[in-house]
Amino acid sequence: MKSIFQLIALLCLSIVACMMESCSNKSEKIVLAYVTSHGTTLPDPDIVTHINYAFAHVDSTFSKLKIDNEKRLSEITALKQKAPHLKVLLSVGGWESGRFSEMAANEQYRMAFAKDCQRAIEQFQLDGIDID
């Protein structure tokens, strides 16, 4: 029985050691920039790895995202042509967004929100949604 326990302990330690080595090799840094809808400056895609575009809001019917300045969002996602490694996310919420809690409390509203998030991801070629 003692040898079985020792064998299991050795196996567990081996797995943990492999996991630690695997994690230590991943030293890629994330450089994230928040970009607002009202700005004019674009971040350098050779420096940043991720851009969070601020903001989109839950609309009054809970069925559609209201994206501030869609034209600017398109300019941001166009940077991915120059820098394919770049990830662009749409930040939903923010200080002035008051409808998110209402949407999250209702299953039907959550489903509509999720579908419209998927639409926005496809339409603007986003890499994800950031819930702010």
Predicted feature descriptions by range:
Residues 25-121:
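Glycan-recognition patch characteristic of GH18 chitinases/ENGases
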Residues 1-27:
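Bacterial Sec-dependent N-terminal signal peptides
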Residues 116-132:
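Active-site groove signature of glycoside hydrolases
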